[in-house]
Amino acid sequence: MRKLFMIIGLDIGGTNIKGVIINNDGTILAKTSVTTGAGIDATENNICHCIETLLELSHINKKEVDAVGIGSAGAIDKQKGMVITSPNIPAWKHYPIVQRVEKITGYTVFLENDANAAVVGELWLGNGKNYKNWIMLTLGTGIGGGAVINGMPYTGNNGSAMEFGHITIDYNGLQCKCGRKGCLECYGSATAVVHFVKSHCTSYPDSSLNPIAQHTMTARHVYDEAKKGDPLALYVFNLIGTYLGIGIADLVNIFNPEAVILGGGLSSASQYFLPQIIHQVQKLSLEGMKENIRYMTTKHGDYTAAIGAAKYALETI
C-alpha cells in the first residue's frame, strides 16, 4: 500500500496568498486565501497564517504534512531557493524564500515560479490534461504565463521562462514596475482594469464606478458593475480584451497552440473580454496558426497555481 502524502501548496502573488492542502491522489482537503501584505515581515506572517488556517480547515495535524510547495511571482532561482526579483512584490529582491519559510514553519519547502506552477496544476487536475500543446496566461495583479510543449511544461534555463506579462505592447507606453515601458501586464491585468477605469471615468459621468474610482477600487468592483451593464465597466473590459488579444496573437504565432487557457483572479470576468481576445487573435495571427484553437479558463480558478506548487513539491520530495 503506497504512502499517502500530504502537501501544502501556496501561490504567493502581489495581492493575495492562495493556499491548498492536497494529497498525492489529487484530493483537495482545504483551501484558503489571505492578503499578501506589505513588506517581508507582513508577508511571512501571512504565510504562517495561511498554513495555520489550512490545518484548521482540514483537521490535519501539522506533523502529517510532508512538504510545502511555493509558487512565487517573479523571476526565481530554484536551485538557490531564491526570488531574484518580483515587480509586484518589491521587497523580494534576492529574497531567500525557501530558507525563510523553512525557518518560520519547520517544513521542507520547494520553490517554483507561480505561472509555471499554474501550468503544472492545470496539467495535473485541470483542462490542460486534454491537450499536448497549449499556453496559459495568469491574470492577476500582474500577468504570468506558461506553455506546455508536447505534453511537457517548458520552464527555461533556470525556471523563469514564459514571462508573458513583460512582452512589449507599446514601447512608448505605460511605465511597468519592471522598469520597462509598454509591458502587456500594464494593459491586461487586474491592475490595468483599475487604471483604465480611473483614466476614462470622466468620459462616463453616469457610471456607478465614478464614486469609488478615486478610492480603494479593485477589479472586483469593475466586474460587479459589468454584470449590471455599467457602460464604463464594459468598455474597460473590452479594452483589456483588445490588448490581451494583441499579446496572445503574438504567442499564437510563436507556439501554435491547441488551446489558450486563462487563469488568475481576473479570469473570472473573462466573459466580458474573451470575445475581444478571440477577435484580435483571428485578426492578427497568421493563417495556419489561429485556426481551431480552444479558449477556456482554468478548472480550479484562483487555486490552480497553489495546486501546481503542491504537485511540484510532491514530485520533488
Predicted segment positions?
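ATP-binding/phosphotransfer module of carbohydrate and carboxylate kinases, centering on a glycine-rich
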Residues: 1-67, 77-82, 99-107, 121-131, ...
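Short loop/turn microsegments at loop-to-beta-strand junctions
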Residues: 17, 71-72, 142-143
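A cytosolic small-molecule/anion-sensing beta-strand core signal
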Residues: 23-24, 72, 149-150
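Short hydrophobic alpha-helix segments
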Residues: 31-34, 87, 157
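A short acidic/small-residue loop/turn micro-motif
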Residues: 35-38, 91-92, 160-163
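A charged helix-plus-loop insertion that forms the helical arch/lid used to bind
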Residues: 81-92
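General beta-strand structural signal in soluble alpha/beta enzymes
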Residues: 109-113
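Glycine-rich phosphate-binding loop of actin/hexokinase-like ATP-binding domains
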Residues: 129-187
